[in-house]
Amino acid sequence: MDSSKRHLLLILDGWGLADDPSVSAVEQADTPFVDHLYDEYPHGVLKASGLEVGLPDGQMGNSEVGHTNLGAGRVVYQEILRISKAIEDGSFFENDALVRAARHAKASDQKLHLMGCFSDGGVHSHLEHLYGLLELARREGLAPAQVNVHAFTDGRDTDPHGGVDYVEQFQKKADEIGVGRLASIVGRYYAMDRDERWARTERAYRLLTDGTGAAFDDPVTALKASYDDGVTDEFVEPRRIRADDADAFGDHGTRIEDGDAVVYYNFRSDRARQLTRAFTEADFDGFERERPDDLLFVTMSPYDDEFDLPVAFEKLNLEGTLGEVLSARGGRQLRAAETEKYAHVTYFFSGGREAPFDGEDRVLVPSPKVDTYDQQPEMSAPELADRVSRSLREADYTLAVLNFANPDMVGHTGDFEAAVAACEAVDRGARQVVEAARDQGYSVSIIADHGNADRLQNPDGSPHTAHTTALVPHIILKDGFEGPVRDGKLGDVAPTILTLLGEDVPDAMDGEVLVPAERAAAS
């Protein structure tokens, strides 16, 4: 490859373009550098949600989906659609791993446990998939009390007080199907940590295996009591639900114990790994625990290449991603993020590949150890900007990929002022890195992977903590290039970058090139 061709892809995670500036931290923040880029350089907008990124129509985008599409250079149809389609066409009920779990419980007169994020947010899971599992259990002949559901309440990708509605919806659906009952509730803050805060994971594990948590007679009361204490869905402390028939199957009918079967129905991997490790790894050292014997543990999708577990929906093998193409052509690349988004610029951007490509360097900066990021809205952006700027000066990379996590991670807290501060921190970091890149002869693309900080308030005035379906920016800086930049989707970014680098676009990338090829090559 031509060593003089260099490109920086800067991802402002959660930096959506607002419909209503009054509720947008992006619009209210003082961001002189990004504002300057809009004034001076060619730009367009990108679709980052729904069908354009392989999600159901109208479904908000997320970081996993966004980075997968960005790296693939095409629309990548996501697990949520694959699973939903399997339920619709009936193949779900013949899925080897799922049927095996149900039959394991039935054959040994043990329990089937279904656990996962309890919402229709569509980012980590979907309740329709849980209902599909209940139907499968019914078809396999499991008794009503033999199927326990452990709800990891959301409140991050959904309304913070939406849990009660989901519980009532579930109870109605379970009654219709004829199997399944809610056995425990805990917020995703505990059950779905991904930053090795093992004390959180341990509290969820103790609830599931020992029943350690406040006891309630019904799940609606359990959640309302949490709300009364000012604790919303994401942060609900462990709660077990009493059952009259608790000893009908096994010694403790709602707990996960020896001989049971578990289906973890989250389809997104990053926040499912820690709890899976606690249940399945013989040499686990995150905390002291007793591991149930003869436990069949099934995951909805592959959570980690190192897990030797039954998987219901294997990952699609994505070939010809941007990283793979550049590596095969002799290019060097850099992937950089803080902990919260490290998997996204590596595993997801590489199409589900854990290992670096030849010539790929990685920069990981630890995220701050705070309970929620509104307490430190700058997160680790200053250190990350320093590290990447230094790397760009010290090595020649064909492609550098950098993610600033702040607008997304702070946006999830619903704290408007903190989200404004997060956007301002990213503006400062972006200035530092972009100026360093331009000094070294890099062209630059500045984008976002989905919306979030563009809407921090609901119409009723309550905090909005979820992602949005907003369009996202696409700004290009390249000497001699004056545009235009056509509007497109995330899957168009990789072929556009290859064109800016003067490289051929592989057949596997069917995304569109959003710049005139002759002008990009000539600049």
From Swiss-Prot:
Mn(2+) 2 binds at residues 13, 63, 449-450. Its EC number is 5.4.2.12. Signal peptide: none annotated. One of its GO terms (biological process) is glucose catabolic process. GO terms for molecular function: manganese ion binding; phosphoglycerate mutase activity. It catalyses: (2R)-2-phosphoglycerate = (2R)-3-phosphoglycerate. Belongs to the BPG-independent phosphoglycerate mutase family. PANTHER family: 2,3-BISPHOSPHOGLYCERATE-INDEPENDENT PHOSPHOGLYCERATE MUTASE (PTHR31637:SF0). This is 2,3-bisphosphoglycerate-independent phosphoglycerate mutase. It comes from Salinibacter ruber (strain DSM 13855 / M31). The lineage of its organism: Bacteria, Pseudomonadati, Rhodothermota, Rhodothermia, Rhodothermales. The gene is gpmI.
